[in-house]
Amino acid sequence: MCAVDFSSTSMSPEDQAIAERIAELKKELGEDLLILGHHYQRDSIVMHADFLGDSFMLSQKAADSEAKYIIFCGGHFMAESADILTSPDQVVMLPNIRAGCSMADMATLVDVEQAWDEMLSSTDLKDPIHRDNPASVAEEGESYLVPVTYMNSSADLKDFV
């Protein structure tokens, strides 16, 4: 659980009303609701979080949860990761669809596919996807280009890998 003390945090009457409504909904939904807050979120958001952490830890919390509704207060790639790791009957929501991450936005799928094709065409490396078993160990003398991605990447890049 989030262990930050927000008792001294002052709020406007409007923010106080929103906070009270969120608390009511959390009480009403109980264990069916999980709110995840990334470290960089402001106090008025993370004060409602069940867990506060980095993108990897929070995605693990989503994967381990049986909550029906998971609200991910973080960047879009974080909610995508949580959605990939949760079951089909769980709903992962991102409160602000514009919540981005400059690192996640550095490479688009089009850019990566173009770079991939250029690396394959300019080297002797092969694409492992064309092997009978792409996960098997390469035979002696074979060299393959192996894609790797970082947690802070969009779901379409993770799918490419």
Model-derived regions: residue spans:
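Active-site loop-to-helix "anion-binding N-cap" substructures in soluble metabolic enzymes
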Residues: 1-161
